[in-house]
């Protein structure tokens, strides 16, 4: 017999009855029923009920056991007594009568229980992550993550892609976030950087004659805490292809992502034939570039119905050309209580309020706005929005660039409050035609809005003749249920166009050469047209596991202060290590 086990804790069935077996695992739960001890023994594969009564030679040893002790149990498989089967367990028809117990690893008092799914403070869970990972839901999420990554790999290879690994130590480059820097011992005063993404390397692969690259790539960004991204590192399905158009990339990747979602959707519907939504349309209809299409609400510009109207607040605003009035339909929201609740919510978001119109039976509009603009305009708004009696509409006004984010939040709030969001689907879409540049209010300059290596629509001519803020790029995102899960673009593969694109964003040619020397040189020796994308593995897994917390699908995540509480990182290092790296610390005054 094997030293530790003949079977796993998830293996025993009716066919094993009367066999002598050996199991090893953790004491998940111990129950005393009238002097009979029931030990639920757990391992990675499942759970088996083991029984020790006073007649068992191992009864005295069983009495000493405590939760999460690691033990070896020998015993005989038998049928559970009639009426005590557990249909929720694969092993639920049988139990093991214990004849011998060996304690392999006793456990101290637990800082958090493994049995059950009760909530515990996050710092405790992260500090004792090895215990947290034993809990059923989190353990299953990690296994699902592995299966999803396997599915991605399989589907990418079926599409003709090849998996390569790119370097982890590289050069620092301006890709939108701070780099994690690694000092060089051999080259004093110089630093490597951990890659924010394999962007330059995957483009260099295309210039090296490879095609259809992918990898599950770790990425590192020294960013301030964000709710939708873990501090430190994350993983992406990184992709690049040569001699392709935007449509070619869509045709290659849509089946991969759709297939992964269908495989792990657990009965939810998955969009087939994804819609393509222009960035400008997405912002106008949904108030965001990552729309949740499970929500059927589409906002509309209804400025004409308020221009010159009796509602002077909006009418005066509309005298300025940049201002608009947008309507947010609220099907079924035509009650005073709901409209007042939305108005209070808007005030809680720092807004002056949220104007509204309700439609009564017979189509009559009600509310302060309806009273001020009159029945004809009210009816025209109702018809434009496709609303009926019992519905409402909410209004935001001003400069769309300033209110669009709030309008998107209001659309989401209305959809949630009126139960309009279809929770039984994964609604996938492409968002296309992103602006190449945006105006950075902090730095008072034009900056890249997305990936700086993307091809502008119109090429070099657009860069030299158009207002930079009107240039669109061959950039695209994949969105799902309100999350951006992938981003990509066709690359700017001509060196003169690359230099011009960076020049508009404030980078001189020499700075481009210094920062992107390897890629700049490669462009001089025959660069193919190429493009690609990167899909966020963590976010996809999060969606498919049905959680909204990235820590629930990650093995050993940091907390929001970028600390690994389990390993004690970041940590101080010895003076000797600092001397070897030629580093002297200049710490801020913490007094």
Curated annotation (Swiss-Prot):
Cellular localisation: Cytoplasm
Catalytic reactions on record: tRNA(Asx) + L-aspartate + ATP = L-aspartyl-tRNA(Asx) + AMP + diphosphate
Residues with site note (Important for tRNA non-discrimination): 33, 83
GO MF annotation: an example: aspartate-tRNA(Asn) ligase activity
Binding site for L-aspartate: 175, 221, 450, 491
UniProt superkingdom: Bacteria
GO CC terms in record: cytoplasm
Chain residues that bind ATP: 221-223, 484, 536-539
Key words of the record: Aminoacyl-tRNA synthetase, ATP-binding, Cytoplasm, Ligase, Nucleotide-binding, Protein biosynthesis
Pfam families per the UniProt record, alphabetical: GAD, tRNA-synt_2, tRNA_anti-codon
NCBIfam families for the chain: aspS_bact, PRK00476.1
Sequence similarity: Belongs to the class-II aminoacyl-tRNA synthetase family. Type 1 subfamily.
Free-text function comment from the UniProt entry: Aspartyl-tRNA synthetase with relaxed tRNA specificity since it is able to aspartylate not only its cognate tRNA(Asp) but also tRNA(Asn). Reaction proceeds in two steps: L-aspartate is first activated by ATP to form Asp-AMP and then transferred to the acceptor end of tRNA(Asp/Asn).
Protein name from the UniProt record: Aspartate--tRNA(Asp/Asn) ligase
Naturally occurring in which organism (per UniProt): Rhodopseudomonas palustris (strain ATCC BAA-98 / CGA009)
Lineage: Bacteria, Pseudomonadati, Pseudomonadota, Alphaproteobacteria, Hyphomicrobiales
């Amino acid at each position: 017999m094997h030293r530790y086990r003949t079977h796993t804790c998830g293996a025993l069935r009716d066919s094993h009855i009367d066999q002598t077996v050996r199991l090893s695992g953790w004491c998940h739960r111990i129950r005393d029923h009238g002097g009979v001890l029931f030990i639920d023994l757990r391992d990675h594969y499942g759970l088996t009920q083991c029984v020790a009564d006073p007649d068992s030679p191992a009864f005295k040893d069983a009495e000493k056991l405590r939760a999460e002790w690691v033990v070896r149990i020998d015993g005989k498989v038998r049928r559970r007594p009639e009426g005590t089967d557990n249909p929720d367990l694969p092993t639920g028809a049988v139990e093991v009568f214990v004849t011998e117990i060996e304690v392999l690893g006793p456990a101290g008092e637990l800082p958090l229980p493994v049995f059950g799914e009760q909530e515990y403070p996050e710092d405790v869970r992260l500090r004792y992550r090895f215990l947290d990972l034993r809990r059923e839901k989190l353990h299953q999420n990690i296994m699902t993550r592995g299966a999803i990554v396997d599915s991605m790999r399989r589907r990418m290879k079926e599409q003709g892609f090849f998996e390569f690994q790119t370097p982890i130590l590289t050069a620092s480059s301006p890709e939108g976030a701070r780099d994690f820097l690694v000092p060089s011992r051999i080259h004093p005063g110089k630093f490597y950087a951990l890659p924010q993404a394999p962007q330059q390397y995957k483009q260099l692969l295309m210039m090296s004659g490879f095609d259809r690259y992918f990898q599950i790539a770790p990425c590192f960004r020294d960013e301030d805490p964000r709710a939708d991204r873990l501090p430190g590192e994350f993983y992406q399905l990184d992709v690049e292809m040569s001699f392709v158009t935007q449509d070619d990339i869509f045709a290659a990747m849509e089946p991969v992502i759709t297939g992964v979602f269908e495989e792990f959707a657990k009965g939810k519907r998955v969009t087939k034939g994804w819609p393509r939504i222009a960035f400008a349309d997405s912002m106008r209809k949904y108030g965001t570039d990552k729309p949740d299409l499970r929500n059927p609400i589409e906002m509309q510009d209804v400025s004409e119905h308020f221009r010159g109207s009796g509602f002077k607040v909006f009418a005066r605003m509309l005298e300025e050309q940049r201002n608009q009035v947008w309507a947010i339909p609220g099907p079924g929201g035509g009650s005073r209580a709901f409209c007042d609740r939305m108005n209070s919510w808007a005030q809680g978001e720092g807004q002056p309020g949220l104007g509204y119109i309700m439609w009564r039976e017979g189509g009559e509009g009600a509310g302060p706005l309806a009273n001020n603009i009159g029945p004809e305009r009210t009816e025209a708004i109702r018809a434009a929005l496709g609303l009926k009696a019992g519905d409402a509409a909410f209004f935001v006004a001003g400069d769309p660039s300033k209110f669009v984010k709030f309008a998107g939040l209001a659309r989401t709030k209305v959809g949630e409050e009126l139960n309009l969001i279809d929770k039984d689907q994964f609604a996938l879409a492409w968002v296309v035609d992103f602006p190449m540049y945006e105006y950075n209010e902090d730095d008072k300059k034009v900056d890249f809005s997305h990936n700086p290596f993307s091809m502008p629509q119109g090429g070099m001519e657009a860069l030299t003749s158009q207002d930079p803020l009107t240039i669109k790029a061959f950039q695209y995102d994949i969105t799902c249920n309100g999350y951006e899960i992938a981003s990509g673009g066709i690359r700017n593969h001509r060196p003169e166009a690359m230099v011009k694109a960076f020049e508009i964003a404030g980078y001189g040619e020499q700075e481009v050469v210094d920062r992107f020397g390897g890629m700049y040189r490669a462009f001089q020796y025959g660069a193919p047209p190429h493009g690609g994308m990167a899909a966020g593995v963590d976010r996809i897994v999060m969606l498919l596991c049905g959680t909204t917390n990235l820590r629930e699908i990650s093995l050993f995540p940091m907390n929001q202060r970028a600390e690994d509480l389990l390993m004690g990182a970041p940590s101080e290092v010895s003076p000797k290590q600092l001397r070897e790296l030629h580093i002297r610390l200049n710490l801020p005054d913490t007094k």
